């Protein structure tokens, strides 16, 4: 029986990617739309769940579209969809399930195992939430690895005979990480990591959106900051402008009928330059400096010690970002890797290592934040320092604070601040049964363990009685094993029906989009279209609407090609209508 392969998934804030080892090399698996990246977007329509590009295209018109859910992982926040509460893990699981399914279709075999990447600066709760999401999606998550580490794996796979110090600058959709690794003889050792979990491409989009809101308000008097539909359109345009400004010095932003004021519909158009973009996002670019310097300091290295700089994440295509990287490190970044795909490829390589398909590769990662407990006076006492290589284990003896104390409360903390209240509490438990004794006499041994996934467990033991209590820190979203199992069973039970629904909803959405295009063309250019063709189009639209209403998807499918022909006809008339005034203007100029 063939050995099961392990896929690598980059579960991103904006986009996600899946990869697998093929012939000793990681390859990217395209989604059903033929794209190598899949938008991390989930849409709910009636009882249907849509993922990826089809979901993203509904973002303007459908209020039940969830984007950037990764930023909510490891929190207690719930997403309300038509009165039903979803956890971030459930939403992420829909993305993972979709990717698992199309990966299976691509490779022609069942897939149950995955390596999933997370930002290096994800805390314990966020890592556990990611594992839970994988479990709900029907995946056994063999390993959670840090995104910059995965990128370095992909970069260094063919360079196992070289010795290099590599800095990975990873600016994604919602998070920013910096990791420094030493590559030597197939060993990838993380020397340090730093980052900012609240900095990414979404922040750059927000700056453009705010700039547009002010411009529109100045020109028309309309304030769009509370108009959800308009804001989604602004976000789409902001993202497009940001991407285009990586290769152009100026772009045009067009927002027809973006709002209404006392004079009627408001349309907005403006030129947006790279200079203006750099100006309004300067503070975001500069925020990346400190984590770079912190990572160098933690690794006890200077910029000149770095041999290669790898850029990861779509946001590193921004020219101002590339400029600051060069200024900080004194060298041009390595451009041999695809910043959107390299993390998933690294995850696939790690999957190959775990499956035994990739040999002579050893990954030594680190914990991004210090771990400890709260002690007398509300102080955080650290047991494991940040940037300690994992897996690891550390013990320390503590005692009681008052005479005859029968129990001790253990508050497990993660962070770098000296006071307990300023750090994240991962969980609390109580060790009871301590024999009566003067304060400071009992010996309580506290042991921290971090596994290869960066997930923490803590044991407290009374040395006198051998009384012991332990806790594996669970996701603060508080999904129990029973909750996860229930979600898995629901997904399995509805898999076939869900697939039929997915195909039908995509067909319906396609038909509705075509109908809207034709109706718009008939309204705007109706007088120019020959009556016979106009009547034919109106009849076709009516038939399609009736099929949609009846949910006759088999018949609807046969109409899609005819609809496409109608759109071509409408497009031709629109182009002709646009060209006529230009010809007229030209004639009038000649006659002057």
From Swiss-Prot:
Question: Would you identify the family this protein belongs to, as annotated?
Answer: Belongs to the heat shock protein 70 family.
| Modified residues annotated as Phosphothreonine in this record | 175
Give a short account of what the protein does: Acts as a chaperone.
Q: Which InterPro entries match?
A: ATPase_NBD, Chaperone_DnaK, Heat_shock_70_CS, HSP70_peptide-bd_sf, Hsp_70_fam
Upregulation details from the record are: By stress conditions e.g. heat shock.
- Show the segment(s) annotated as Disordered: 571-592
Q: Which SUPFAM superfamilies match?
A: Actin-like ATPase domain, Heat shock protein 70kD (HSP70), peptide-binding domain
* Keyword Phosphoprotein among UniProt keywords: yes
Q: Which UniProt key words apply to this protein?
A: ATP-binding, Chaperone, Nucleotide-binding, Phosphoprotein, Stress response
The molecule here is called Chaperone protein DnaK
The species this protein belongs to is: Mesoplasma florum (strain ATCC 33453 / NBRC 100688 / NCTC 11704 / L1)
- Whichever gene encodes this chain, its name is dnaK
Q: Which PROSITE patterns match?
A: HSP70_1 (PS00297), HSP70_2 (PS00329), HSP70_3 (PS01036)
Q: Name one GO molecular function term.
A: ATP binding
Residue ranges, compositional bias (Polar residues): 571-580
